[in-house]
Amino acid sequence: GVVLFAKTSKALARLNEMFRVGEVKKTYWAIVKNCPPAEEGELVNWLVRTEKQNKSYAYDTERTNAKKAVLHYKVIARSDNYYLLAIDLKTGRHHQIRCQLAKMGCPIKGDLKYGFPRSNPDGGISLHSRSAEFIHPVSKQPVSIVAPVPADSLWKAMEQMKR
């Protein structure tokens, strides 16, 4: 998936600030087994992180120590057994996508921690940092970075079916 590195400490400070204020649009792809309740939608939950379990829990209403989490999802492909979701992350919380999709009834393929029944053969989960877009802080030109899908037959098939 997409990983950004800064060449200098000044560039790192600028990049970190852009992430902090939401100037970087991050898109993720996730493969889920269950059909989402709608073709697209916005999920708004309050997440509580547990350090001991290294897990977050999603609630529909505000809670003490909870942080608001917002994402937008859209079904962009489907196979006989799985759905490919494009996820536009509005906030960046601990395990946010994993937690919110599980709360919606759509745990990510291979994600045992958040309710998928079995692991993937490689032990990973089917969540991919697909792209990052932002305005370059110096040149003011748009920057768009798109990562290829993982070298896995299901990912390749889902990408081919993408609408």
Task: Give, region by region, the residue ranges found by the protein language model.
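RNA pseudouridine synthases
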Residues: G1-R163
